[in-house]
Amino acid sequence: MSENELTSGDFTEQNEPFALFAAWLREAEATEPNDPNAVALATVDKDGLPNVRMVLLKGFDSQGFVFYTNFESQKGQEILSQKKAAMCFHWKSLRRQVRLRGLVEVVSDKEADEYYKTRARGSRIGAWASKQSRPLEGRFALEKAVAEYTARYALGDIPRPPHWSGFRIRPLSIEFWHDRPFRLHDRVEFRREVPEGAWEKVRMYP
């Protein structure tokens, strides 16, 4: 795909951000060599200092963007405290970026249970064994915990840990960016005051 292939009419005239995101993600799934659903997640601590890390988007619809994590981790604690977060997708193969930010809610137990059951058995054991974001004396301590939980759940199903679930970001803004020559990029932002509100679309200077 050439850098001039996408014209302004290809996406800047779209009025439904979730449909536009779905289309862009589908294209990324066909062109990105690794994890097209990888996204930078930004949170802030109690002092207002930001933290950012990569996570995997595990679902989205008109209600928001979903990912899963250990709620006792740094990001889990910061989100539970602040109830706000931001994301940034960057698809180098497509020369595109999507930024969003908004309010965060916890997914239902049913939704978390259903996703948890789809994870590899080793990943489900890891959710029990890892005290995410806390000091680790050495690799052996982690491997020992994995062995202990593997033995504990050798027979039958592995339940979802009470500290492991999902968050849904209900976006208040979503910005779509596409690279153009000479830094004259296309940028369109969708904004709303509340998660249930109507979108306002604004074209932005690059």
Swiss-Prot record:
SUPFAM superfamilies: FMN-binding split barrel (SSF50475). It holds the Pfam family PNP_phzG_C. Binds 1 FMN per subunit. GO terms for biological process: pyridoxine biosynthetic process. Substrate binds at residues 58, 115, 119, 123, 183-185. The keyword Nucleotidyltransferase does not apply. Pathway: Cofactor metabolism; pyridoxal 5'-phosphate salvage; pyridoxal 5'-phosphate from pyridoxamine 5'-phosphate: step 1/1; Cofactor metabolism; pyridoxal 5'-phosphate salvage; pyridoxal 5'-phosphate from pyridoxine 5'-phosphate: step 1/1. Signal peptide: none annotated. InterPro entries: Pyridox_Oxase, Pyridox_Oxase_CS, Pyridox_Oxase_N, Pyridoxamine_oxidase_dimer_C, Split_barrel_FMN-bd. The keyword Glycosyltransferase does not apply. Keywords: Flavoprotein, FMN, Oxidoreductase, Pyridoxine biosynthesis. Belongs to the pyridoxamine 5'-phosphate oxidase family. Homodimer. This is Pyridoxine/pyridoxamine 5'-phosphate oxidase. It comes from Rhizobium rhizogenes (strain K84 / ATCC BAA-868) (Agrobacterium radiobacter). The gene is pdxH.
